[in-house]
Amino acid sequence: MKVSLNWIRDYVQLPADADLKKLAYDLTMSTVEVEDATDLGASFHDMVVGVINTIEQHPNADKLKVCKTDIGGRVEDIVCGGSNLREGMKVAVALPGAMCKWHGEGDLVEIKKSKLRGVDSYGMICGAVEIGLADLFPTKEEAHILDLSDFDAPAGTPLADALDLNDIILEIDNKSMTNRPDLWGHYGIAREIAALYDLPMTQFPHFDRNVENTSGFHVTVEDAERCPRMTGTQIENVCVKPAPYWMQVRIWKTGMRPINALVDITSYVMLATGQPSHAYDSDHIAGHIIVRLAKAGETLTLLNGKELPLSTDDLTIADDAGIVGLAGVMGGAKDSILPTTSKVILEIANFQAAGIRRTALRYDNRTEASARYEKAIDPERCDQALDLSMQLFSDLYPEMKVTGLVDEYPRHLKQAEIDVPLSWLERRLGKRLSPDEIKHKMELLGYGITFNGDNMHVVVPTWRSTGDVSIQADIMEEVARMYGYENFEAEPITTTFDGAINQLDKDLERRIKEYLAIRCGMQEIFTYPWMEESYVNAVLQSTEGILSLSTPPSPAERFVRSSLLPNLCKAVVKNERYFNEFSIFETAQVFRDENYTSPYDPREKLPSQRKNVAGAFATTDKDITALFRKAKGVVEMMARYVHMETLTFRQTEKPVWADNVVWLNIYRGDEKVGDLALLAKKVSMACGIKNMNVMLFQLDQDSLVPLKSRTNTFTHLAEYPMTDYDISLLVDGSVQWKDVAQTVRGIKSELLHGAAFVDEYRGKQVPAGKKSLTLRLAIGSKDKTLTSAEIEEVASGVLNKIAKRFGAELRR
């Protein structure tokens, strides 16, 4: 949020020479995080008001003029191509040294004395867009020069002085104000500054509510819980015109765009008080105003003419004919201010925070008003906003007349009252503060304080009673921040720590991530805990039993993650555009509706939240066998490298997303813990994967059992060479490598040190129903170098064993 220091000075008497760095620091330490303090006037250095005395045609350019311009004490020639130049016109002149954007585009450039088409030019006559004032002085013409003739500023006046731009703008981090609805306006920030420095505050003038309702206008609130207060004021004898410059520039400084006087009054009041308001064209309201929930099938007509279907959970502003706006979020076309508007109804209301938040999220339309309503505004602030609004209307429209004022306040806010023992406060703060000191500081913030022995009774002001301050700890925080956190002395705490608990599941997760990322070269991804409906339908092929969010980020993302695979496939689609081959993985919780009972509160029924690990291997290569072996190898070797119980593979239940042939279920003992399969072609197409084959695996990480301990054994490096001996065998097509490897491992020989898979081949040179299987034997002795005959003898023994079990024969 942007805060104007000049605006703050309207409400609190800050010294003219106030230390701005200290102010920003004190606010940050006590109240809100001030991210930056910008001297707005510094952007307009070396810029002055100039008066064009004469205009002559440029001798060498048809579209350029030579303007003799009074810049205060002297007249200079300035070449300009503006379309609206005239003699006697006041303009913004950027002198040499000023920084501007040429036609408002690109980076800032330094203005220098130059020669344009043979004529000397001392500086530049500027359009609003070239000095960053396009929103304050909008124009549709590119060559339009900023006309300052209406400003009472003689030639040579610094532009920042003439346009009231000498101001300090504080940039406040909105996150630091999330629980402080009282700070979303200049008056709330001023109140904090006044309390910090014990300065007096200026109050808004009071508007007399004794108004005769001559128009018969009235308001009905049907849902008092969603709308605790609604004030409506009917005002006649107004018109659409520009707001005065002082109002426009304040609105612009704080990041909004001035529109017209009627709309700008509502913007100004919101920026001043933090209370949103809305002006309706009274001639377009049929009957009276009703605050109610939308009915099934109702729509809101937007300014662009589109019809917005509404939810029955939406709180609306309606008249006798239908919906005119979404309460606290946005208005519709029917109620909008038009050039012919002469009579308005001013709405200043209080709405339930949660309802506004749901509606704003539902339609992805978070406005300045809804952002404030979402924080739970004090309903008493409607009075302050009404007082200021009426003052502004009477100032801008001296002939205006209030013909109706209705204040529906069915649910008054109850001020919070909290008892805090001073002894408790002392123990928590680690310091004893005198009751008088506490009382003085707290009363500066608007609290009512009384003492009875050790007890301090606190009456919380309404602007802090909307949930912000409700318990003893909140009062402790208020006392501490007003005293100054930096004024508490730090004392070392003596304590003892128990040894760290060995959390095997956390260690297992860390080792899995290290194995997949470092050893296997996979990229870890992080996705949202919700899934897009299109990917759910494509991969899981059903939404049955999947939990959904009551307020999803978008209608298409309402399903809670029940599997990691839909989001993994979405990531494959995004990466397919950039890579021919890649592998990714994710470890995260999945949520399933299994009547899970919280271990912390048995009364609380939650969905199960089990950790899963899933990965995808994607390639444009058509070799499915190689892709399958790569993925299977990664999963198979995981058990060894992360030190957990061995995983095995069977075909028992095909996943719905899997290819009809290339799939396996993953088991730990007799328990199925996951799946490994090629993504079916139709599923790939449904996901939008165009030219890639994708192998997926998913494991229930919580079902994997880490081994509690392990014993590492070490052997000496071999003194004699080890021989790799390749054997190619013809075996039946159904023979699996794992069975061959198991047979080789069962051979008792001190010279045989292992066997590794090399290749598998089916083709023209191999008989039908057979396949060629190549394995590599590691043969050697720890005592000597083996002869060729000894090596052949070991290899023959292996061949005979395999031939006996599988009917294999040596392929020649």
Please place each PLM-identified region on the residue numbering.
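Conserved catalytic alpha/beta cores of large enzymes that bind or transform nucleotide phosphates
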Residues: 129, 240, 308, 312-414
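Terminal amphipathic helices with adjacent charged low-complexity linkers/tails
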Residues: 195-222, 397-425, 432, 475
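Glycine/proline-enriched, intrinsically flexible loops and inter-domain linkers
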Residues: 4, 11, 25, 65, ...
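Conserved mixed alpha/beta core segments that line enzyme active sites in large multi-domain catalysts
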Residues: 48-79, 266-334
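Short, hydrophobic beta-strand segments
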Residues: 4-10, 167-176, 228-236, 368-375, ...
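Phosphate-backbone binding interfaces of nucleic-acid-interacting proteins
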Residues: 1-207, 345, 362-364, 368, ...
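A carboxyl-terminal module marker
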Residues: 2, 22, 427, 444-447, ...
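Extended, well-folded interaction surfaces typified by the phenylalanyl-tRNA synthetase beta subunit core
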Residues: 418-582, 778-782, 790-812
